[in-house]
């Protein structure tokens, strides 16, 4: 997962009064367009033309109209508005260019400094540095950027930007963007910053809601040695503590290489189902002092000790289920996001902002791409191949089948031994980054350059990549390393996060303007990270790709895209449901999530797996703490395959990765056209999967 500017834990009960009160704040009066404004716009525009000449009319009309669109009555009367226009409209092209460069440089310092404050405030909650205290949660829930938008409209900087640089629609970017220079793109991105005027209190409440959800997810671990099967036997090693959903899913995948892994896979799937349905006993979450039989759903005091934690004196071991906390956190993010809706007339829902503004890919197009993968005839053919390789009928958890990967030749214990020996600490992984990068095809000079711009921290959660926001700062790779070293799951995730960090470094340090920093949307950085992650065994010296292994890798990509497309579709349908039922309770949201997960499963997965009403598509943690993040993953799989084909054509991952990352934040299709020669879509992956099937069969 990639984080650039992350928006602690308020309980849902504590959050609701704040949200309810704030929801009344955007009054009709405060959002209404002042009655005098149209006449003032005409007068201010005419005055500019009279002063500077007819040549600036078109630019003046657009700039004044843009400024007026976000002017509020509290900003001042007609005389004040016209004064702001006279003061801040720039007629001279050279002066306008100078102002743009100053704005770009100063916004970099602003973004970077606030970003570093935010990172520091979240240090204790994000990193594995001991217990989280209430003061840590309070700092983590504070957003230092919350007042910037308010302040910059109040001090007229935002209006200066709107008067001089064009607010462009997505249609305009798609139509005209291919002809724009890098500076024109940067000017458009600068103006995009001020396309909405969300009040500071709303921005802060959104940040607090997501921080609360993130803290909940980051602490949601299961102690696996304390899971008991129907015979009361322990199936997992002592000390194994897995975070939901990432480590649970990856442990399930790891069991494909174990001869006796099937019972453990079934048990993990049962644990996942208990989490999604919230029938999991609350006492077992991140608790090594309780034994749990997930099939019978019974709990008892732990009969073994595999933790250095003291037993809490007041702990009561009860089977009472988790009280819909998972869905209370999700509902908290939804209610917070709704507060921004009145201030976003062009994108009046979180759904519209997620797709139209952030991804710049329409929701309908994304859904069509997901459905194209989910309904492909290739799914049944690949499923039959998996079934034949397993020698048994498919079970629902086989959506995570990973037997196409060469790692299937190694047990998880063998891989853990290698990675723990190689990376006993986060510092050891950091020291190995230059070797990893040269192994991926980067020159020694570029590998050294990148390693100098990346630092490694011990993650409290599964791990994430937090890029820098100004030149001079470093990207942070957060990875989970246990007392005995980095296990294979951690290494695989760390490579993914390293891919993010490398992209983040190139797309910050090596773009011509700060306003162009980044990639088109998060799916692109996920795609680039997948390219790193897929080379894990090769980097460990355990596998060399040949034609057959590459074909199997393509089938693995396809099966992964199939699985995550279903998960993403559940995420999208769930947000639509919340908007249709804004007064829902956590219990009602739980019921809706289960219904949507089952319906999506029955539509696309049951015909393949032969079992209905499965809820596993609802297990992903990002569904709770990242607000419509999940569609980035299937889009990322599609993009990743297009990138891999381009790398295969040229033969050098390092050179191509750098070339692509340095394009900056263009629109998705333009970025992809310049990177690979084709727009974003599943076509390349589907065609490659069909060819791979022919080769493997």
What are these regions (language model features)?
Residues 27-305, 333, 337-410, 582-697:
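C-terminal, non-catalytic "cap/extension" segments appended to globular domains
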């Amino acid at each position: 997962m990639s984080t650039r500017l992350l928006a602690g834990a308020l309980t849902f009960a504590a959050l609701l009064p704040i949200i309810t009160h704030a929801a009344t704040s955007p009054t009709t009066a405060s959002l209404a367009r002042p009655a005098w404004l149209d006449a003032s716009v005409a007068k201010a525009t005419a005055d500019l033309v009279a002063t500077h000449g007819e040549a600036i009319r078109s630019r003046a009309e657009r700039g004044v109209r843009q400024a007026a669109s976000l002017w509020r009555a509290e900003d001042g009367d007609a005389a004040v508005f016209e004064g702001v226009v006279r003061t801040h409209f720039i007629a001279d092209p050279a002066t306008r260019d100078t102002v743009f460069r100053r704005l770009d440089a100063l916004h970099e310092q602003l973004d970077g400094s606030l970003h570093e404050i935010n990172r520091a405030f979240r240090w204790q909650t994000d990193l594995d540095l001991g217990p989280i205290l209430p003061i840590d949660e309070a700092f983590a829930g504070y957003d230092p950027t919350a007042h910037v938008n308010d302040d910059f409209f109040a001090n007229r900087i935002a209006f200066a930007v709107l008067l001089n640089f064009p607010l462009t629609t997505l249609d305009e970017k798609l139509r005209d963007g291919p002809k724009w220079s890098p500076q024109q793109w940067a000017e458009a991105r600068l103006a995009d910053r001020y396309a909405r005027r969300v009040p500071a209190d709303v921005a802060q409440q959104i940040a607090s809601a997501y921080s609360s959800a993130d803290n909940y997810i980051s602490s949601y671990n299961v102690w696996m040695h304390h899971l008991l099967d129907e015979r009361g036997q322990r199936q997992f090693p002592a000390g194994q503590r897995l975070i939901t959903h990432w480590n649970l899913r990856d442990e399930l995948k790891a069991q494909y290489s174990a001869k006796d892994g099937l019972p453990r896979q079934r048990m993990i799937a049962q644990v996942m189902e208990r989490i999604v349905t919230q029938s999991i006993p609350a006492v077992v979450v991140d608790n090594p002092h309780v034994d749990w039989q997930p099939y019978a759903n019974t709990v008892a005091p732990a009969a073994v000790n595999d933790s250095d934690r003291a037993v809490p004196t007041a702990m009561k071991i009860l089977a009472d289920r988790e009280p819909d906390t998972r869905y209370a956190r999700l509902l908290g993010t939804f209610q917070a996001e709704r507060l921004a809706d009145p201030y976003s007339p062009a994108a009046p829902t979180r759904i519209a902002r997620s797709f139209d503004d952030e991804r710049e890919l329409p929701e309908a197009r994304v859904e069509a791409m997901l459905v194209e993968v989910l309904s492909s005839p290739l799914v049944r053919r690949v499923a039959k191949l998996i079934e034949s390789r397993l020698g048994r009928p498919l079970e629902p958890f086989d959506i995570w089948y990973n037997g196409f990967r060469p790692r299937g030749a190694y047990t998880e214990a063998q891989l853990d031994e290698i990675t723990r020996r190689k990376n006993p600490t986060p510092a050891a992984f950091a020291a190995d980054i230059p070797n990893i990068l040269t192994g991926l095809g980067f020159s020694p000079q570029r590998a050294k350059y990148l390693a100098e711009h990346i630092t490694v921290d011990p993650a409290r959660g599964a791990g994430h990549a937090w890029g820098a926001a100004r030149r001079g700062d470093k990207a942070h790779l957060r990875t989970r390393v246990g007392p005995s070293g980095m296990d294979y799951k951690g290494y695989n995730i760390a490579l993914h996060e390293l891919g993010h960090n490398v992209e983040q470094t190139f797309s910050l340090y090596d773009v011509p303007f700060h306003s162009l920093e980044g990639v088109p949307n998060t799916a692109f950085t996920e795609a680039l990270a997948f390219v790193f992650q897929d080379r894990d065994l090769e980097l460990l010296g355990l596998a060399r790709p040949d034609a057959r292994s590459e074909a199997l890798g393509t089938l693995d990509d396809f099966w992964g895209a199939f699985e995550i497309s279903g998960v993403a579709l559940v995420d999208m349908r769930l947000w639509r449901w919340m908007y249709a039922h804004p007064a829902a309770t956590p219990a009602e949201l739980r019921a809706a999530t289960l219904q949507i997960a089952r319906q999506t499963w029955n539509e696309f997965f049951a015909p393949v797996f032969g079992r209905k009403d499965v809820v596993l598509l609802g297990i992903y943690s990002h569904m709770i703490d990242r607000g419509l993040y999940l569609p980035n993953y299937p889009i990322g799989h599609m993009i990743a395959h297009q990138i891999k084909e381009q790398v295969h054509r040229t033969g050098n991952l390092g050179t191509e990765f750098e070339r692509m990352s340095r394009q900056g934040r263009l629109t998705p299709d333009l970025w992809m056209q310049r990177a690979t020669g084709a727009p974003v879509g599943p076509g390349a992956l589907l065609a490659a999967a069909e060819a791979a099937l022919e080769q493997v069969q």
